[in-house]
UniProtKB/Swiss-Prot annotation:
EC number(s) stated in the UniProt entry for this protein: 2.7.1.148
SUPFAM superfamilies in UniProt: GHMP Kinase, C-terminal domain, Ribosomal protein S5 domain 2-like
Family: Belongs to the GHMP kinase family. IspE subfamily.
Keywords: ATP-binding, Isoprene biosynthesis, Kinase, Nucleotide-binding, Transferase
Summary of the function given for this chain in its UniProt record: Catalyzes the phosphorylation of the position 2 hydroxy group of 4-diphosphocytidyl-2C-methyl-D-erythritol.
Protein name, entry field: 4-diphosphocytidyl-2-C-methyl-D-erythritol kinase
Gene: ispE
Gene3D superfamilies the UniProt entry points to: 3.30.230.10, GHMP kinase, C-terminal domain
Reaction it catalyzes: 4-CDP-2-C-methyl-D-erythritol + ATP = 4-CDP-2-C-methyl-D-erythritol 2-phosphate + ADP + H(+)
Ligand binding (ATP): 111-121
Active site: 26, 153
GO molecular function: 4-(cytidine 5'-diphospho)-2-C-methyl-D-erythritol kinase activity; ATP binding
InterPro entries: GHMP_kinase_C_dom, GHMP_kinase_C_sf, GHMP_kinase_N_dom, IspE, Ribosomal_Su5_D2-typ_SF, Ribsml_uS5_D2-typ_fold_subgr
Length: 320
């Protein structure tokens, strides 16, 4: 557990209210990556899918901006201006002309550097929490604008559900997704840097591989049908080859999940978390148990999707 501030850490929370937000991680069901642009970014076409693995973020009024993180991967995260949640607090305060005098407490379940946009989720949660705590009543379009300034995945953490993302991923269109899909998430033993995975993808393409995905239309149709067996063979991620190149153990994990009974497995985003689509909740339990004993990953979690984006918890608990 760690706590820091931008100068002198406040010893006590200022007891003038709090807001707690739950925010989901995401799986990319489809991710096509364009060639690198002149500005260094890549054009993306992706289908985001929010899943029930959530971080809980509590924001309180305080004397100074501070950040504390506990839970999954907390010891690997900065608790200062390098953290996107801290930047979100500063951006929101700047937007409304106030000092960013809040304490942020993050209880993490989304893996760090896992390809599930955990840092982006926490930033989105801070925006929503401060909007509630300070009774700003900013419209969703303003929150989306601030989210897009923070990063490509932050707008989807606000949006939730299932969405088609274009541009750098920040331009979203809601996708109809019937029924509940069941997932097993396998966390790798170490993280992958998103820039490193993009660099490796560029290198692989320079030598002629990997192949490009077809258009996402069939994926959208399978989601609208609510059929996991129709969706499974359509899951695709052009970054997967690069992630596996950097972490070859992912190949074993992907194979083990399918051998355990999953319909299909995919590296989520830039990795290294592997997401396995299962027919039913019971099948997900079986796959989870077998993966846990296979020695191919650090931790296994069961999740469902789609779920809503960042939302205020009606009766927040007290983070100490």
């Amino acid at each position: 557990m760690s706590r820091t501030s931008d100068g002198n850490t406040a010893e006590l929370w200022v007891p003038t209210g709090s807001a707690t937000v739950r925010v989901p991680g995401k799986v990319n069901l489809y991710l096509a990556v364009g060639d690198r642009r002149d500005d260094g970014y890549h054009e993306l076409t992706t289908v985001f899918h929010a899943v029930s693995l959530v971080d809980e973020v509590t924001v309180r009024n305080a004397d100074l901006l501070s950040l504390e993180v506990v839970g999954e991967g907390a010891d690997r995260l900065p608790t200062d201006k390098r953290n996107l949640a801290w930047q979100a607090a500063e951006l929101m305060a700047e937007h409304v002309g106030r000092a960013p005098d809040v304490s942020i407490f993050i209880d993490k379940s989304i893996p760090v550097a896992g390809g599930m946009a955990g840092g982006s989720a926490d930033a989105a949660a801070v925006l929503v929490a401060m909007n509630s705590l300070w009774e700003l009543n900013l419209p969703r379009r303003d929150l989306r604008m601030l989210a897009a300034r923070l990063g490509s995945d932050v707008p989807f953490a606000l949006h939730g559900g299932t969405a088609l993302g274009t541009g750098r991923g920040e331009e979203l269109a809601t996708v109809l997704s019937r029924n509940t899909f069941h997932w097993v998430l396998a966390f790798a033993r170490s993280g992958l840097s998103t820039p490193a995975v993009f660099t490796e993808l560029d290198r692989l393409r320079d030598v002629g591989s990997p192949p490009r995905l077809a258009e996402p239309g069939p994926v959208l149709a399978a989601l609208a049908a609510g059929d996991p067996e129709q969706l499974a063979p359509l899951l695709g991620n052009e970054m997967q080859a690069a992630a596996v190149s950097l972490d070859p153990a992912l190949r074993r994990a992907l194979r083990a999940g399918v051998e355990a009974g999953a319909l299909a497995g995919i590296v989520s985003g830039s990795g290294p978390t592997c997401a396995f689509l299962c027919r039913t909740a019971e099948s997900a339990l079986d796959v989870s148990a077998q993966l846990s004993g296979a020695g191919v990953c650090r931790t296994v979690r069961i999740a469902t999707g789609p779920v809503p984006g960042a939302r205020v918890v009606p009766t927040p608990g007290i983070a100490e």
